Amino acid sequence: MPLTSAFRAVDNDPGIIVWRIEKMELALVPVSAHGNFYEGDCYVILSTRRVASLLSQDIHFWIGKDSSQDEQSCAAIYTTQLDDYLGGSPVQHREVQYHESDTFRGYFKQGIIYKQGGVASGMKHVETNTYDVKRLLHVKGKRNIRATEVEMSWDSFNRGDVFLLDLGKVIIQWNGPESNSGERLKAMLLAKDIRDRERGGRAKIGVIEGDKEAASPELMKVLQDTLGRRSIIKPTVPDEIIDQKQKSTIMLYHISDSAGQLAVTEVATRPLVQDLLNHDDCYILDQSGTKIYVWKGKGATKAEKQAAMSKALGFIKMKSYPSSTNVETVNDGAESAMFKQLFQKWSVKDQTMGLGKTFSIGKIAKVFQDKFDVTLLHTKPEVAAQERMVDDGNGKVEVWRIENLELVPVEYQWYGFFYGGDCYLVLYTYEVNGKPHHILYIWQGRHASQDELAASAYQAVEVDRQFDGAAVQVRVRMGTEPRHFMAIFKGKLVIFEGGTSRKGNAEPDPPVRLFQIHGNDKSNTKAVEVPAFASSLNSNDVFLLRTQAEHYLWYGKGSSGDERAMAKELASLLCDGSENTVAEGQEPAEFWDLLGGKTPYANDKRLQQEILDVQSRLFECSNKTGQFVVTEITDFTQDDLNPTDVMLLDTWDQVFLWIGAEANATEKESALATAQQYLHTHPSGRDPDTPILIIKQGFEPPIFTGWFLAWDPNIWSAGKTYEQLKEELGDAAAIMRITADMKNATLSLNSNDSEPKYYPIAVLLKNQNQELPEDVNPAKKENYLSEQDFVSVFGITRGQFAALPGWKQLQMKKEKGLF
């Protein structure tokens, strides 16, 4: 096939395009067959996404376990050619059967099916409405499932997985006694997907619970008629698990082949910084053998760039890693989110918008906090998410201090004063549409004892119980106060380095105290105590020097008028308005004497705000096996928040733990520890004090929902459980009738009776009270549209429609009058 013809299907529309290698040429795979892969073949997949206004593309070449070396080489060559065709910006991935990346598996929400054979044995990707099928599928996984065609025998079964017996017109799901509810639900959704995409919605599905086979005698008879007499089922086969700690070990290598041989030089290990990458070179980043990245600098030659994948394979061989090791090649300036998150920070020069504005007190770089319209926070949750604000901070506030491991109310006049030797709970209550919502901040001082830290976490759970677990819990380590926390105290937040505010404290105040005052309005201003030395000063901020006799408010030459006004207001709180204002460069000698003498400090010109280029990422977290495992959900939507799971949303400067209503007690209790372990094992060397917010299902604030497109607060009440879906599948008697017909030698599966029956659009637009044909299911009218009419009505193919979430399908059907 000519190259231009092969890539004619490429456009800028979001979605995926799949080609199979057939006789060393690219053949387009129909959308209805996406997610089906023959084990004897190789494939090339192009994924196109829009991130804001930018186009993001990934090219994967997939290697079946029985494919030939020639086919594998051909797929790699086409991947390189497609990359060139698209201007060299896509990220390239090498995928091997059974070892696919989370990104790849995420494209196929209903699962991946491995089919025996390949193009060499005459296997074709068939279109919809084919019933001449007889196979047994072994389904593994809970989040992104994989189904493999296995021998049609009871010997293929085990107690821990789910199996689908697919007989064309009938699909029977057998659930291993030790499989979990998530696996059973995903397998059922796969069975429904096969029914709807491949059988035009006309196959029947039955379910057998492996520990209650006697309750399904008719279905068991079908299984035994097909597979023979039931034998003893094998024990559970444990899944291969890669510990998150293993993923956290990373090494950066410089690679060259100038002497004709692959030369690898170790550059650095965790934590990595972006400046290590030279734009004229190529590098390999080794994630402990679990994944290999190749970074191609802009200045590298075309030959070096094209050889990137072969260099990675040579590196894998040199390291004696498995040949199935996942490989990703990235281009300088077009790096994937997965690659960038392996570095301590990833900045983009000349970028004016971005996420992750994280800075520490004392650094010369400044954050310019833009003012925003608070009325947008609930009408546009994406604004709340970007600003990290649920409202303007005008709700009700209650503050307690941990004292003798118990909660002691803080007097109102001391609200906003926090001491580094203490821990505090701050309960904030606000209303949305007349309904109260709660945020519980757990502020932990840098010098608080371990007992106090533990008590603050325990007491937070107790306070949360008063609201039936509806409060959002936010752990705040001293110095990492979120913007909303500062807004609560209206520009009057003061953080003392040590000491305590409890009564009877015998520790005297230091004779000299220096506070750095940061912020330009009441939503982002705080005073933080810093060491009382001249070296603590910064020309871009305002500082308050306080003694028992004199008070100086020092204006750095880079501070703005708004910053000075807010600092003066806060200083008057600490000094009763008796402070002397001093401009940088006009300090009296006494000022320097109080700071121990004049010494150099950060006085360079104001630096540009640094924009960290990070993307929000969603993970499923688990430590059920004794190993901490996180699985990323790519291109996530609200549908990916499973009520049986604990999910982690990482927005870099905040980490959200979302707890599903049906999550088990152990996972709920260990939620905070899970988030802390995630930060600790993150390969980039993340700040362990990153704020952690614990969110309960049904009580999500806009700072969380804003990270999801088109958040629907009613999605779970409208959603269906595994048992409800099972009830909808119909009775076993219908399956018995079909299987009896299938055994009848006079019945041809390709006869006119088995052909799908279609009706004109006008007929199907009638409601139930009108004259719908008797054989039309009013809840599934779309199944009776011809392929041409289906595209005409919905604007997409039947396969694309089947891949949509259930709520989206229902919405489209209502809009078109087909429900």
From Swiss-Prot:
Residues 731-819 are annotated as: Headpiece. The keyword Plastid does not apply. Changing R135Q: In NPHS21; inhibited actin bundling capacity; slightly decreased interaction with PLCE1; disrupted EGF-induced diacylglycerol generation by PLCE1. Most highly expressed in the small intestine and colonic lining. Weaker expression also detected in the thymus, prostate, testes and uterus. Expressed in podocytes (at protein level). Residues 628-819 are annotated as: Required for interaction with F-actin. Changing L425M: In NPHS21; inhibited actin bundling capacity; decreases interaction with PLCE1; disrupted EGF-induced diacylglycerol generation by PLCE1. Gelsolin-like repeats lie at residues 24-73, 145-185, 262-306, 403-454, 525-565, 628-669. Keywords: Actin capping, Actin-binding, Calcium, Cell junction, Cell projection, Cytoplasm, Cytoskeleton, Disease variant, Phosphoprotein, Repeat. The keyword Calcium applies. A 1,2-diacyl-sn-glycero-3-phospho-(1D-myo-inositol-4,5-bisphosphate) binds at residues 109-116, 135-143. One of its GO terms (molecular function) is Arp2/3 complex binding. CDD domains: gelsolin_S1_like (cd11290), gelsolin_S2_like (cd11289), gelsolin_S3_like (cd11292), gelsolin_S4_like (cd11293), gelsolin_S5_like (cd11288), gelsolin_S6_like (cd11291). Ca(2+)-regulated actin-binding protein which plays an important role in actin bundling. May have a unique function in the morphogenesis of neuronal cells which form ganglia. Required for SREC1-mediated regulation of neurite-like outgrowth. Plays a role in regenerative sensory axon outgrowth and remodeling processes after peripheral injury in neonates. Involved in the formation of long fine actin-containing filopodia-like structures in fibroblast. Plays a role in ciliogenesis. Associates (via C-terminus) with F-actin. Interacts with SCARF1. Interacts with PLCE1. Interacts with ACTR2 and ACTR3; associates with the ARP2/3 complex. Belongs to the villin/gelsolin family. This is Advillin. It comes from Homo sapiens. The gene is AVIL.
